[in-house]
């Protein structure tokens, strides 16, 4: 039964990726960016139902354009990278030409970064800042790679520094999966694709995947290092299973 479920979900997900890749550029051309974003949000909802992702949100999405900074426990996080307004998503260049996934990511205007290249990381900074100043949001993972889902990995300070210098607001997003199987880590060296496919198949066999998203209140940073520490503490706090759920603004008030 679980194998049949996985086959159906994989087929439906590939079809949805193809629909997004083919339809979104045309919708954006004819109807404009806002209509394209509404289509994208509908697509996200369809993907959640297809994968049976049960998403719990704690706190609110920001009312103003913001840089959303999230921890990165799984590749499933790509289905959680959205805001109520058009959003620029930063992703690893390695996935740009992946069948279905890469095609769809190119259609939504993903900003690609070579994670091991400092110059590439520097080049994406103005793209993110310009997006926010153009009344869009941006979503990225300052860890730069997926982790084991237990604690955040090493966080790079670059985007915190850029946000502080530009005076644009940032919102922290804590991502916690109820099923430990969702977390995924690989060094992207030998054997990555077979390892990824085996892990994906095991997730597709799961009856349901629960995920909890916790949003902080938007804040303008004055000290990049302090903002980075706040992000790390916010994520660690959310990942603790023994902490009762409470409003996101209870963590940081300034």
Language model regions located:
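Catalytic core of membrane glycerolipid acyltransferases/transacylases, capturing the structured
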Residues: 20-31, 64-118
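A cross-family acyltransferase "interaction/gating" segment
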Residues: 101-102, 150-226, 245-253
């Amino acid at each position: 039964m679980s194998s049949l479920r996985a086959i159906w979900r994989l087929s439906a997900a590939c079809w949805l990726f193809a629909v997004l890749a083919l339809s979104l550029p045309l919708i954006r051309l004819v109807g404009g960016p806002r209509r394209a974003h509404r289509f994208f949000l509908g697509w996200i909802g369809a993907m959640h139902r297809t994968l049976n992702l049960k998403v719990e949100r704690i706190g609110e999405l920001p009312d103003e354009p913001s840089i959303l900074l999230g921890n990165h426990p799984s590749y499933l996080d790509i289905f959680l990278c959205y805001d109520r307004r058009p959003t620029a998503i930063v992703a690893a260049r390695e996935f740009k030409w992946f069948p279905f996934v890469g095609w769809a990511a190119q259609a939504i205007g993903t900003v690609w970064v070579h994670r091991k290249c400092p110059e590439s990381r520097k080049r994406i900074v103005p793209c993110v800042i310009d997006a926010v100043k153009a009344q869009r949001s941006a979503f990225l993972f300052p860890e730069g790679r997926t982790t084991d889902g237990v604690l955040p990995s090493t966080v790079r300070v670059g985007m915190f520094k850029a946000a502080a210098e530009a005076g644009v607001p940032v919102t922290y997003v804590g991502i916690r999966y109820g099923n430990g199987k969702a977390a995924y880590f690989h060094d992207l060296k030998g054997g990555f694709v077979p390892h990824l496919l085996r892990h994906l198949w095991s997730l597709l066999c799961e009856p349901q995947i629960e995920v909890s998203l916790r949003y902080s209140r938007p804040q303008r940073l004055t000290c990049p290092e302090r903002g980075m520490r706040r992000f790390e503490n916010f994520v660690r706090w959310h990942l603790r299973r023994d902490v009762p759920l409470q409003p996101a603004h209870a963590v940081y008030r300034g």
